[in-house]
Regions:
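Short beta-alpha junctions and helix-cap segments that line functional grooves
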Residues: 23, 49, 64-68, 145, ...
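P-loop NTPase nucleotide-binding/switch module
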Residues: 94-150, 167-227, 242-245, 280-299, ...
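Short, compositionally biased
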Residues: 39-45, 75-86, 142-163, 183-198
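Short, surface-exposed secondary-structure boundary micro-motifs
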Residues: 17, 31, 67-68, 86, ...
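P-loop NTPase catalytic core
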Residues: 219-220, 226-541, 545-549
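C-terminal amphipathic alpha-helical interaction region
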Residues: 535-589
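N-terminal accessory targeting/assembly segments
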Residues: 1-101
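Short histidine-centered loop motifs in beta-beta connectors
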Residues: 49, 54, 116-126, 156-165
Length: 589
């Protein structure tokens, strides 16, 4: 029996251990704390413990499992809330109360829950990795598809159960893999190592945006299904609120929300709000398509790393069924801090700001598991990763933000000044970018309008021009500007307040369809073009402002319901009439 030699926080060492292998899951101490082997040398085996090690003593036993840290994948995951190593927190609360007891070893899935299973294969059928052998209704929104595990090649069905009611551990199928004689039993669930990406047939070209209903995201800085985005911002800039809003309204089939080292109250807020909110497409609560991984700031530091990998493994599992998954990781900085703490305890040579030298490779391992793929069974699915980054003091030059930028193509930089000015989402349009816009042009042309890309380009150009002029205004004031530049300042304000700013508590403004976003931009450009034409005919900016259209378009997000888009045509006609009248009155004068 191998025994503990030293304890340093979550890092435990065992001496003279010959039986352990790298990345093996172990049980540490008399209480069987879950740990993982992270280092082996001639003298010691180093173990990272995913639970609180308070009370652990030298000499206590360490048992190997001969398998890596795994997630249990099967029906019953959706609507669940788990800790970083996929222990069900609801069941643990009933067993141990409000706090997680050391060494709690509850199964990830409810083994007593009965599912109405439809078996889709018969005796003698030939099956291969990824083939669906049974289906069951997991929630009213999600049809769960039980698949042949990816590590099994071609096989023949030796025995298939009849359709009926089964629990997750009941044997549904017995298969004989090619080249073997022994039958392998398959239940509704199987295990998969969390640090091993699930295989795919091939990655596909990204062509479809993740529609969030947030104008600055969908129009200005879009993210594609299968893409990766970073949401960096200092304290109070709205990282969590932005992720909550995307999780509520995006058109992904399933949301995996990972609370990694953040406040417990935020996870409570997700639980409360998602159970009350109704999915507009199905009429069901949002919890029917949500998985929560809660590893809050007062939980063991080492488990933050496991929570990230557990979440993305669950996402890949549902992706293989053909679903589109969105992952919200809040926050990857807390995970990086956990890496730094454990690296320090291991006495590794620190790199920039004390983070370990392997920080970039760990971030890459996570973000590269996003993608739009053809699954091993020939279907399509995607995993979209949106990771919050919490740089101290809003310093975007720190290592986590800079290394994250290397692996994402969408960067939503949150601005403290915008947040404190109550401008939400507080995404700074000058510091943010999206490399997906060009890939999504065909989708926007087909589903929003042929002129969407050109309209978007003009809106972005006006924002850049306004930003440049604001530098001058800060120095010498707006009064000295010529009228054409005053017009850009005014139209920029309409774009910022009337289009980019969004009210999450307003029934029509919390989610805005793509076609309304286009019509709003076209109305703003109509006002700008008519104003510029009037200025060229010697009208004054002051007279144009008196028409009231700048204020009216700033409020159109509230005044035009999402189901009455024909009102925009009336707006444009009224704008044309107003400017015709101002020009006529000017000529008469």
């Amino acid at each position: 029996m191998d025994r503990i030699y030293s304890i340093n926080g979550p890092v435990v060492k065992v001496n003279d251990a010959k039986d352990f292998s790298m990345m093996e899951m172990v049980q540490v101490g008399e209480k069987g704390l879950i740990g993982e082997v992270i280092g082996i040398d001639a003298e010691y085996t180093t173990i990272q413990v995913y639970e609180n090690t308070a009370g652990l003593k030298i000499g206590e036993p360490v048992k190997g499992s001969k398998m890596p840290v795994c997630a249990t994948l099967g029906p019953g995951i959706i609507s669940g809330i788990y800790d970083g190593i996929q222990r069900p927190l609801t069941a643990m609360t009933e067993l141990n109360g409000a706090f997680v007891a050391m060494g709690s070893a509850l199964p990830a899935l409810d083994e007593e829950r009965v599912f109405d299973v439809t078996v889709t294969v018969r005796d003698g059928d030939t099956v291969k990795a990824g083939d669906v052998y049974a289906t069951c209704r997991e929630t009213p929104l999600i049809l769960h598809k039980c698949m042949i595990p990816p590590d099994i090649g071609s096989a023949k069905v030796a025995l298939a159960a009849e359709s009926g009611k089964y629990k997750v551990n009941d044997v549904i199928l017995k298969i004989i893999p090619d080249g073997e004689s022994d039958a392998v039993p398959l239940t509704l669930a199987h295990k998969w190592a969390i640090k091993t990406p699930r295989p795919v047939r091939r990655r596909k070209t990204i062509k479809t945006p993740l529609i969030t209903g947030q104008r600055i995201i969908d129009t200005v800085f879009p993210i594609a299904k299968g893409g990766a985005a970073a949401v960096p911002g200092g304290f109070g800039t709205g990282k969590t609120m932005t992720q909550h809003q995307i999780a509520k309204w995006c058109d992904a089939d399933i949301i995996v929300y990972i609370g990694c080292g953040e406040r417990g109250n935020e996870m409570t807020q997700v639980l409360e709000e998602f159970s009350e909110l109704i999915d507009p497409k199905s009429g069901r609560p949002l919890t029917d398509r949500t998985v929560l991984i809660a590893n809050t700031s007062n939980m063991p530091v080492a488990a933050r790393e496991a929570s990230i990998y557990t979440g993305i493994t669950i996402a890949e599992y549902y992706r293989d069924m053909g679903y589109h998954i969105a992952i919200m990781a809040d926050s990857t900085s807390r995970w990086a801090e956990a890496l730094r703490e454990i690296s320090g305890r291991l006495e590794e040579m620190p790199a920039e700001e004390g983070f370990p030298a392997y920080l970039p490779s760990r971030l890459a391992e996570f973000y590269e598991r996003a993608g739009y793929v053809e699954t091993v069974s020939g279907g399509e699915g995607s995993v979209t990763v949106i990771g919050a980054v919490s740089p101290q003091g809003s310093d975007f030059s720190e290592p986590v933000t800079q290394n994250t930028k290397r692996f994402v193509r969408c960067f939503w930089a949150l601005d403290k000044a915008l947040a404190y000015a109550r401008h939400y989402p507080a995404i700074n349009w000058m510091n943010s970018y999206s490399d997906y816009a060009d890939d999504l042009e065909d989708y926007y042309a087909e589903n929003a309008g042929e002129d969407f890309i050109e309209v978007r380009r003009r809106i972005s150009a006006l924002l850049i021009e306004e930003n440049n002029l604001m530098e001058i205004v800060k120095l010498i004031g707006a009064d000295v500007l010529p009228d054409d530049q005053k017009l850009i300042i005014e139209i920029g304000k309409v774009i910022r307040v009337g289009f980019l700013q969004q009210n999450a508590f307003h029934k029509d403004d919390t989610f805005v369809p793509l076609k309304k976003q286009l019509l709003m931009m076209k109305a703003i450009l109509k006002l700008y073009d008519e104003s510029a034409a009037a200025l060229s005919k010697n009208a004054l900016v002051s007279d144009i402002l008196k028409l009231g259209w700048f204020e009216k378009l700033s409020k159109m997000k509230y005044d035009v319901p999402n189901d009455k888009l024909e009102m925009f045509a009336e707006y444009e006609e009224a704008i044309t009439r107003s400017f015709y009248e101002i020009l006529i009155s000017g000529e008469t004068a």
